[in-house]
Amino acid sequence: MNIIDQVKQTLVEEIAASINKAGLADEIPDIKIEVPKDTKNGDYATNIAMVLTKIAKRNPREIAQAIVDNLDTEKAHVKQIDIAGPGFINFYLDNQYLTAIIPEAIEKGDQFGYVNESKGQNVLLEYVSANPTGDLHIGHARNAAVGDALANILTAAGYNVTREYYINDAGNQITNLARSIETRFFEALGDNSYSMPEDGYNGKDIIEIGKDLAEKRPEIKDYSEEARLKEFRKLGVEYEMAKLKNDLAEFNTHFDNWFSETSLYEKGEILEVLAKMKELGYTYEADGATWLRTTDFKDDKDRVLIKNDGTYTYFLPDIAYHFDKVKRGNDILIDLFGADHHGYINRLKASLETFGVDSNRLEIQIMQMVRLMENGKEVKMSKRTGNAITLREIMDEVGVDAARYFLTMRSPDSHFDFDMELAKEQSQDNPVYYAQYAHARICSILKQAKEQGIEVAAANDFTTITNEKAIELLKKVADFEPTIESAAEHRSAHRITNYIQDLASHFHKFYNAEKVLTDDIEKTKAHVAMIEAVRITLKNALAMVGVSAPESM
């Protein structure tokens, strides 16, 4: 239990003891305490006096006074109590308890903020999963940044997380990729008799793949058409996935599993799932096609599994894939989809229900659109290539840290304008610069302290930490673990970036309000230890969203 929860629990226990001591109730109802909206009204407040009115048969202000008179303020860490309005009790804490967070943060280091106990739940988080037919773009970048941050947050909160990328390597788009490579391959060999497919891929990368294969694998020209197409499908996916994996690795995004759609066919899982759904009575034949009765589970219409020409819809392998996720022992399935997949939510959830799997185990987040902005105008095309701007170009333009940070600053269900000019600014207007500068500033102060012979470990008396800004800063440090818990519970990566901004802001306010290195050696030791705790917290929070914490800027 983190220090904030410990203090709240102690306060509740002492209020209950006070009610007993005052003889106000034999059975005490739930005591709820909350943080007042206005900090002038204390650290915590409760309405328990009004709740007890009928039980105690007394005026709520009298009840409140009785609770106050019988409260052990020392045990409850309370220095002042006010009774407000009809009987609210406002508690002002003796915030010295907060200093206990300093040695805790220093001792735990890069594990500070992490929950010690496992949740005992396996989470499979699938994100990005872009088709291996071209470059990653800004939508994929947002998916990668949010997905990776969410995986870090869930891990810190005690979940067993598997990060997975689903490779769509079995559909028509891969056939079109193979045909496109085939055309460029023969062109490189001087044979222009092959034409690009109608939905082919015309990018420069396909030309380069064709040239490379013509040089390294010229014997493919002698394969039968069927064997050649199969080889180009395989090689095309390999080339594209190597490029995607490289870009994602540079974007500080890593996966535990790369799951191939083709493997579902090779292992017979699609036929297995189809047979199971038929056996359970959820499929039927109509208009020469095979349908899944998803309307039984709140979908707006039934869905086709096998078209009347005998080919599978995309939905069937998706069902098999999600059933495979369940079979692997995952308790929670989280999918991060692009904005164009909104219509998939109900049908996927319904498909799980056909197997008797609670659809609440599947959580789908939709990543809304991102607009790249420069000088107040939307930038749709690359000045260099004339094509859509790629993840690679974004990394080259603003850097990985800025891209990762900006793309996790907003809830994924909201549209977002990515200001590339702001992301490059070295000023406090740039959120990521502001946060990283706080870390660098702390490192600079710690270096000065060390030069003066003051080590972080030297502090053991924190009673000198009394400045209001210092107390607010410590409250923010103590709030790190609860913030992680909240971000994990709500699957909300942007809660961490919001926290980082608040923590950096509180540090800068403290720095501007009071000298860290003073003539008072004991106070200086306490300050040095405190800002080391802040540095650790800031570094851990930045790492959670995939951003570095520089020691100098």
UniProtKB/Swiss-Prot annotation:
Q: Which GO cellular component terms, listed alphabetically, does the Swiss-Prot or TrEMBL entry include? A: cytoplasm
Fetch the InterPro entries from UniProt: aa-tRNA-synth_I_CS (IPR001412), Arg-tRNA-ligase (IPR001278), Arg-tRNA-synth_N (IPR005148), Arg-tRNA-synth_N_sf (IPR036695), ArgRS_core (IPR035684), DALR_anticod-bd (IPR008909), Rossmann-like_a/b/a_fold (IPR014729), tRNAsynth_Ia_anticodon-bd (IPR009080)
Write the record's keywords in alphabetical order, separated by commas: Aminoacyl-tRNA synthetase, ATP-binding, Cytoplasm, Ligase, Nucleotide-binding, Protein biosynthesis
Q: Which SMART domains match?
A: Arg_tRNA_synt_N, DALR_1
- Location in or out of the cell: Cytoplasm
Q: Classify the source by domain of life.
A: Bacteria
What is the catalytic activity of this protein?
tRNA(Arg) + L-arginine + ATP = L-arginyl-tRNA(Arg) + AMP + diphosphate
Residue span of motif 'HIGH' region:
130-140
**GO BP, sorted A to Z:** arginyl-tRNA aminoacylation
The main location class comes to cytoplasm
Q: Self-association or partners: how does it assemble? A: Monomer.
So what family is this one in?
Belongs to the class-I aminoacyl-tRNA synthetase family.
What's this protein's name?
Arginine--tRNA ligase
